[in-house]
């Protein structure tokens, strides 16, 4: 060191310390790697100082003492954040560059600057056993990979000073980052570098002659030296443990392919670029079996690469300056590239899918965003996509960080290949080259990807096209955000995405020819998997559960029209009737109506205890599901819990609940009268339409085979199908179900509805619960593993027959929607061998008291219930038979508590009873406003739609029931059958009642068909005893006379008579200014078989009187003067009690007696409630003969519609 420092005696003490540090670094890091005979440490340190001073550009008297020399090992170990360092930048220059970079991409910050001095040897990694065709900076402490904008093969093995560089670390512990060498390195060693071309340069063969040589028969192993312009630089490939890359040299119209496969030459790929002229010596001629014996050139151990440069530039500086390049191919702009050929084709399997050819272009741009590093997707210039998936994965992203400028050659341009990617996407194939022309000055996180990621494996295994791959990446990102890691492990995300792709694409659409990579790299004209692409296919969007809920609520509330919710009689309703009619409404939308493109919904089915429903959920939200089967069977298996499913067809239902105080229908356009509104959004699903992406662990082999047979289960290939089959197989063979347990086999007899039950006598706490009655098929059994839903063993059938009561409380209420009478279940208690935990306990009888109840068993939250796919022969019993609506109406032996099935034809929300408080407030998390919600369902017979029964439900007594909308098939359990004073049968709910929807016409049967018209009835038949429960029918007859006609204006608030502009109520006075017009007429209708009294309400009176709109409005104005007019039949004329001589009364009397009113009429009527009366005796004259006949009471009907034709 003294010898070295003697050359710098005039320097300051600070300079001396810095020089000492340089000497120690040279002695420790670089001297051990050099030949001891070549250089002394002092001479090498002297050369380092000179190169540093020259790089700084300052006076030789100044040294960069602020820069600390750093070794490679220190850089890797200590530098945990990205940084940059430059010897030639001033502070002002750095700030200007940083500001300019941040203005280009405002979301990123510039790389922080560190004053570090980096020196090392450039090598290709062979010394470290890491020869992967990359440059590395090496010293005695280790090596780190690096990237350069331009490099020369003459730099290999030389000691270099790196003036300007960026270091990008990895976040993984123990992993090294990489260097970005911004400026060319400066050679420190000055030894002469001799160039061995490996052959005489005077024998350089042109590309045209080389192509002719390969075309004609020649001996293999012939060595030639070829010079030409590089037109293709292929990626470095690893095939069967061997690395190689492809170069294509061109000259004029001729080209020749070179395969570089020697380990020591693989760094050449970093030294050449498209457009550069090179010579390569000692190339051998060989044949490729993959190309049917086609001859190509390959390198040998003696081959050398030499760039073509003028001779006068051969000097020391030539080694570190940029190589001379000839102009590259014309670089296309985005506007030029979008002018793609207009011709396209169609897929044979789907004529709606267009297939277009891609265009090969060159492009230059700036990386603005990393869309998906694992998928190799980037964004250029804010609008163009770049995909590198069809090339081998580059380490560290190939330096493609936001802000980097790149040059692309021989890339494929596609336009609108996918709806989930930029419109214009550039694709790099095995013939494309990606060259960085300027490193990014911005700080961005390094996203490290595996060399062979799951997405790339799927791409290669299934030979996907560009459009399919973009859709696969879209699914992979969506699944990772919404389902991982709770339901889908991170390493299985791509597998799930692949299954989704299989579900969307048909087998014919996915199958392509086997790839030949040598043909893709070498053969002309070029053809590869990217040469043809589908336009925007697959186009199915994968929505999250929250996205669907938000869209549904926004769509329904924004399109809310209050007049559309009301019937035609809305102008005649009082405020109480109007507001009651607005309390509830529902909207049904199909999933395909949410978007012009197909929609998919992906989620996990889980049982929810708070609402006792099946839910579809992901990380964003959860959505209640009303699940039915196509055969209207209610038997939803417990194995669906935990299944990852894809929903392609379903109906979105939103039930709206509003509290309003509109004075009249004229105020419906004023939303201020709406005091409260909220909604319930849920899905109507048909289980047969679900695609099982990942089955639950308890899904049995028999169920999976049944689904596969009917084509409803997703079939996947390769590893996906193997996992599906293994997951669907019987769980008895699974090795991970090793917990000891006990089980009990039972068949469910019946179950009660979910209600709030007292937990203990000491507190007033109540919780949800329900009770079931079951018959034990066998005794309690011990297991060494969890049997789940495997086949029933013989030992489980011993000792059965006991009837027990099963009590479900708290979180156990979640089993309610999957427990069905008549089905067999296995109850399992894990982690115990005590059979007593599943034995039902009874109450001991004392004092001669007879015990009527069965032994009971309270289920624990950790216990599991599994539906068994088959029933044992000794326990088979049909589910309790349900009555039909006809049997409920007509059966004389019907019990007081009945269960029946039918179809909802009407739902009416009953008027709110302000005096009565709700018995039990709803505990559903979204149903806090469903207090005092009582509805009347009109349920019609499935076989005879004319037979109907009213069911009154108090929905505030338990959990809210989903799906009670018109057209739904349902089963009503445990309701009380009652007979009114008018001898009409109706039903009302009990605390143990429950309603289960078993069929949804809009889901299982496609678009809902128009309801069949009511049957045509004769009045005599309708009045008979056998048809008394036909509620709605069509009748044709003659209007004999009008019995009464009442026209009135009443106050919409209190119902009193309204005269002109004031309400007639005086005690207490009413100051309302809103009035509604009401009309009612009662006529005698006769059809030859009988007669009926038909009532016409406000909206149908006008049609009965045959008045047009102007006449009807004028009549209303005249009536408003008096407020009330009523005429009725007395003898053969019509009169009025108040003023029979009034002009209005005389007009109405004349009108009601006219032939325009007493005419043939065709009406649809609903039967009114009427008491059973005695027959009346009347005198009937036939000529001179008088008869006394017995006439039954007239049939009372309410007109619903007057048919004009």
From Swiss-Prot:
Organism in which the protein naturally occurs: Danio rerio (Zebrafish)
Organism superkingdom: Eukaryota
Functional summary from the UniProt entry: Component of the CST complex proposed to act as a specialized replication factor promoting DNA replication under conditions of replication stress or natural replication barriers such as the telomere duplex. The CST complex binds single-stranded DNA with high affinity in a sequence-independent manner, while isolated subunits bind DNA with low affinity by themselves. Initially the CST complex has been proposed to protect telomeres from DNA degradation. However, the CST complex has been shown to be involved in several aspects of telomere replication.
Biological process annotations from GO: positive regulation of DNA replication; telomere maintenance via telomere lengthening
A Pfam family per the record: CTC1
This protein's record includes keyword Thylakoid: no
Positions with biased composition (Low complexity): 327-340
Stretches for region Disordered: 303-349
Subunit annotation: Component of the CST complex.
Membership in a protein family: Belongs to the CTC1 family.
Gene (UniProt): ctc1
Keyword S-adenosyl-L-methionine included in the entry's annotation: no
Primary location: nucleus
GO molecular function: single-stranded DNA binding; telomeric DNA binding
GO cellular component, as recorded: CST complex
Protein name: CST complex subunit CTC1
Alphabetically ordered keywords of this record: Chromosome, DNA-binding, Nucleus, Telomere
Protein's cellular compartments: Nucleus; Chromosome, Telomere
């Amino acid at each position: 060191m003294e010898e070295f420092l003697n050359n710098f005696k005039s320097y300051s003490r600070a300079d001396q310390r810095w020089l000492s540090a340089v000497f120690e670094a040279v002695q420790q890091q670089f001297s051990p790697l050099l030949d001891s005979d070549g250089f002394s440490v002092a001479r090498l340190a002297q050369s380092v100082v000179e190169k540093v001073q020259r790089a700084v550009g300052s006076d030789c008297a100044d040294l960069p003492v602020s820069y600390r020399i750093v070794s490679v090992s220190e850089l890797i170990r200590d530098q945990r954040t990205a940084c940059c360092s430059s010897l030639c930048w001033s502070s002002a220059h750095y700030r200007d560059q940083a500001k300019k970079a941040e203005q280009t991409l405002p979301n990123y910050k510039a790389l922080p600057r560190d004053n570090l001095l980096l020196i090392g040897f450039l090598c290709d990694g062979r010394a470290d056993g890491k020869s992967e065709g990359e440059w590395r900076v090496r010293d005695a402490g280790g090596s780190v990979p690096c990237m350069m904008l331009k490099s020369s093969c003459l730099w290999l093995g030389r000691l270099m000073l790196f003036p300007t560089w960026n270091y990008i670390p990895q976040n993984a512990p123990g992993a090294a980052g990489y260097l970005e060498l911004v400026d060319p390195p400066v050679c420190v060693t000055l030894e002469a570098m001799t160039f061995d071309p490996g052959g005489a340069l005077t024998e350089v063969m042109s590309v045209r002659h080389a192509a002719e040589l390969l075309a004609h028969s020649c001996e293999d192993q012939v060595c030639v030296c070829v010079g030409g312009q590089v037109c293709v630089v292929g990626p470095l490939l690893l095939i069967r443990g061997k690395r190689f890359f492809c170069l294509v040299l061109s000259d004029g119209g001729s080209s020749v392919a070179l395969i570089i496969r020697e380990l020591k030459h693989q760094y050449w790929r970093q030294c050449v670029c498209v457009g550069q002229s090179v010579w390569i010596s000692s190339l051998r001629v060989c044949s490729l079996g993959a190309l049917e014996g086609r001859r190509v050139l390959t390198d040998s151990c003696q081959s050398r690469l030499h760039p073509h440069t003028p001779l006068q530039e051969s000097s020391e500086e030539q080694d570190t300056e940029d190589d001379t390049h000839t102009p590259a191919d014309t670089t296309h702009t985005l506007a030029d590239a979008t002018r793609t050929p207009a011709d396209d084709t169609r897929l044979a399997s789907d004529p709606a899918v267009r297939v277009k050819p891609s265009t090969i272009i060159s492009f230059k741009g700036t990386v603005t965003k990393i869309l998906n590093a694992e998928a190799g997707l980037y964004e250029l210039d804010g609008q163009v996509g770049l995909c590198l998936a069809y090339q081998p994965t580059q380490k560290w992203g190939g330096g493609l960080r936001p802000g980097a400028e790149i040059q692309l050659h021989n890339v494929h341009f596609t336009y609108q290949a996918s709806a989930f990617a930029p419109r214009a996407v550039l694709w790099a194939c095995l013939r494309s080259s990606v060259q960085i022309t300027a490193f990014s000055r911005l700080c961005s996180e390094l996203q490290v990807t595996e060399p062979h990621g799951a997405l790339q494996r799927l791409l290669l295994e299934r030979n996907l096209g560009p459009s399919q791959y973009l859709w696969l990446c879209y699914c992979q990102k969506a699944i990772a955000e919404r389902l991982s890691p709770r339901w889908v492990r991170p390493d299985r995300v791509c597998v799930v995405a692949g299954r989704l792709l299989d579900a969307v694409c048909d087998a014919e659409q996915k199958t392509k020819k086997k790839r030949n990579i040598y043909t893709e790299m070498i053969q002309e004209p070029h053809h590869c998997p990217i040469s043809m692409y589908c336009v925007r296919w697959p186009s199915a969007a994968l929505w999250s559960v929250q996205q669907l809920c938000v869209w549904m609520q926004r769509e329904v509330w924004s399109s809310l029209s209050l007049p559309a919710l009301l019937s035609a009689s809305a102008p005649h309703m009082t405020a109480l009737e109007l507001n009651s009619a607005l309390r509830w409404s529902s909207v049904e939308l199909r999933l395909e109506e949410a978007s012009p493109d197909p929609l998919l919904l992906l989620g996990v089915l889980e049982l929810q205890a708070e609402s006792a429903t099946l839910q579809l959920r992901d990380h964003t939200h959860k959505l209640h599901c009303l699940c039915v089967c196509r055969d209207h069977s209610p038997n939803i298996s417990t194995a669906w819990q935990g299944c990852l499913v894809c929903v392609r067809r379903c109906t979105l239902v939103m039930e709206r609940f509003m509290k309003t105080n509109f004075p009249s229908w004229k105020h419906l356009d004023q939303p201020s009268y709406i005091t409260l509104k909220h909604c319930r959004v849920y899905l109507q699903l048909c289980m047969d339409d679900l695609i099982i992406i990942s089955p639950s662990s308890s899904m049995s082999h028999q169920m999976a085979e049944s689904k596969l047979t009917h084509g409803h289960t997703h079939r996947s290939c390769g590893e996906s199908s193997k996992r599906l089959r293994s997951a669907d197989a019987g769980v008895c063979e699974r090795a991970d179900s090793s917990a000891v347990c006990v089980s009990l086999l039972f068949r469910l007899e019946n179950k009660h509805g979910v209600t709030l039950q007292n937990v203990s006598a000491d507190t007033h706490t109540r919780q949800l619960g329900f009770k079931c009655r079951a018959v034990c098929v066998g005794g309690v059994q011990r297991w060494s593993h969890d049997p789940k839903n495997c086949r029933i063993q013989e030992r489980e059938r011993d000792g059965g027959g006991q009837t027990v009561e099963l009590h479900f409380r708290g979180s156990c209420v979640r089993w309610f929607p999957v427990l069905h009478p008549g089905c067999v279940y296995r109850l399992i208690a894990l982690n115990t061998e005590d059979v007593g935990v599943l034995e039902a306990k009874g109450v001991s009888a004392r004092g001669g008291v007879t015990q009527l109840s069965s032994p009971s068993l309270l289920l624990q939250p950790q216990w599991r219930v599994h539906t068994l796919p088959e029933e044992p022969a000794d326990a088979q019993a049909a589910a309790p038979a349900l009555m039909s609506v006809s049997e409920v109406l007509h059966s004389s032996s019907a019990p007081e508590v009945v269960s029946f099935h039918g179809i909802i034809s009407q739902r009416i929300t009953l008027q709110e009873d302000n005096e009565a408080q709700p018995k039990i407030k709803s505990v559903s998390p979204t149903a806090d406003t469903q207090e005092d919600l009582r509805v009347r369902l009109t349920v019609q017979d499935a076989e005879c739609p004319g037979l109907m029964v009213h069911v009154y439900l108090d929905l505030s007594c338990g959990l809210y029931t989903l799906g009670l909308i018109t057209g739904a098939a349902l089963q009503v359990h445990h309701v009380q059958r009652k007979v009114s004073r008018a001898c009409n049968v109706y039903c009302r709910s009990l605390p143990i009642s429950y309603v289960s929807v078993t069929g949804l016409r809009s889901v299982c049967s496609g678009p809902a068909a128009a309801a069949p018209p009511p049957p045509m009835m004769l009045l005599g038949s309708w009045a008979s005893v056998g048809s008394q429960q036909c509620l709605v029918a069509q009748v044709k007859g003659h209007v004999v006379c009008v019995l009464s006609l009442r026209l009135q204006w009443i106050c919409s608030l209190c119902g009193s008579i309204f005269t002109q502009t004031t309400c007639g109520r005086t005690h207490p006075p009413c100051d309302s200014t809103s009035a509604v017009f009401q009309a009612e007429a009662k006529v005698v209708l006769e059809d030859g078989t009988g007669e009926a009294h038909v009532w016409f309400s406000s909206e149908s009176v006008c049609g009965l009187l045959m008045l047009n709109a102007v006449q009807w409005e004028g009549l209303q104005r005249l009536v408003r003067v008096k407020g009330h007019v009523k005429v009725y039949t007395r003898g053969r004329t019509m009169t009025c009690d108040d003023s029979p001589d009034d002009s209005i009364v005389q007009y109405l009397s004349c009108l009601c007696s006219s032939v325009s009113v007493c005419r043939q009429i065709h009406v649809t009527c609903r039967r009114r409630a009427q008491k059973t009366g005695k027959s009346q005796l009347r005198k009937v004259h036939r000529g001179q003969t008088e008869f006394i006949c017995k006439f039954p009471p007239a049939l009372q009907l309410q007109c619903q519609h007057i048919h004009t034709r």
